[in-house]
Amino acid sequence: MKPIFSRGPSLQIRLILAVLVALGIIIADSRLGTFSQIRTYMDTAVSPFYFVSNAPRELLDGVSQTLASRDQLELENRALRQELLLKNSELLMLGQYKQENARLRELLGSPLRQDEQKMVTQVISTVNDPYSDQVVIDKGSVNGVYEGQPVISDKGVVGQVVAVAKLTSRVLLICDATHALPIQVLRNDIRVIAAGNGCTDDLQLEHLPANTDIRVGDVLVTSGLGGRFPEGYPVAVVSSVKLDTQRAYTVIQARPTAGLQRLRYLLLLWGADRNGANPMTPEEVHRVANERLMQMMPQVLPSPDAMGPKLPEPATGIAQPTPQQPATGNAATAPAAPTQPAANRSPQRATPPQSGAQPPARAPGGQ
């Protein structure tokens, strides 16, 4: 009986033929690139199916990321706010550090004598006593601080140490009612005592004669008398001059230059009291004060005319005008000009009349 379907090649032959065809196609594609264009067409035709099959996955990822990113954004926002706050606080501290650096530079730049030593200290507290004006500093006996030690700032005299502990000390301010300080007027070298009147008021110069030559704006410096404070440091500037007609006295007030209500950094001085037995002359104090004022408080310095003549140089001032006498032709008037400074100073120490309007007219009589 003849079968309906004829038998074809065996499976093994088919497999061998398929393998040979596949190898031929692979070799032809690798050598000649015959099917590269066909693959490109096939990838282009199949690519929409890739997007369609990947769309659900991208949708689910987007939804989950949206839900999770809100909390993450809130955390990041909170962290950024905290970081911004810290940066702003650091900027504020940077400004404060710059101010402190400038103050310390001014403080360390205060001119001193060669035999004077200094140490920077900081005010850590103020004494809450309505009857005493004191501050507490962060230096004590371990740092060599002693009672009576002078204390200054970058603008002038502050006070003196009155109590010393191991790590801290108390400083009595010059504005305290129990404090008195020997001073000298820079313009004419008059020496007086400046007494404290409370830090809310100015220093007071009491019981001065009515004709005392002290004016508003005069700079008062330490005279060095008593050996406690160094010579030539600025203390105050005269703020008011009032005449007491009943007692023929002049009441003078002077505003401290150190800014006693805004103290932060101070200088402790050593060696200022070594020459207490031999204080400087008024002329030397005048010279030292001018040198220190040029660095410490140039904005308060009066004009050179208001300071008066330079006292250490009277001899050179007299010798210089003599060559000009032949040009003027008047030898009698030449020596009169150099004697004017001495005449201006002599009435200040002489006993003047009681009337405040007559001293200028009697100045020649004081000669």
From Swiss-Prot:
Transmembrane feature ranges: 13-35
UniProt feature, compositional bias: Polar residues: 345-357
Pfam families hit by this protein: MreC
Gene3D superfamilies reported for this sequence: Rod shape-determining protein MreC, domain 1, Rod shape-determining protein MreC, domain 2
Single Gene Ontology BP annotation: establishment or maintenance of cell polarity regulating cell shape
Coiled coil: 63-92
Membrane topology: Single-pass membrane protein
Signal sequence bounds: none
Subcellular locations according to the entry: Cell inner membrane
InterPro entries in the record: Cell/Rod_1, Cell/Rod_MreC_2, MreC, MreC_beta-barrel_core
Primary localization class, coarse: membrane
Annotated stretches, region: Disordered: 300-367
Function per UniProt: Involved in formation and maintenance of cell shape. Responsible for formation of rod shape. May also contribute to regulation of formation of penicillin-binding proteins.
Family of the protein in this entry: Belongs to the MreC family.
Subunit structure: Self-associates. Interacts with MreB and MreD.
Name this protein carries in UniProt: Cell shape-determining protein MreC
Gene: mreC
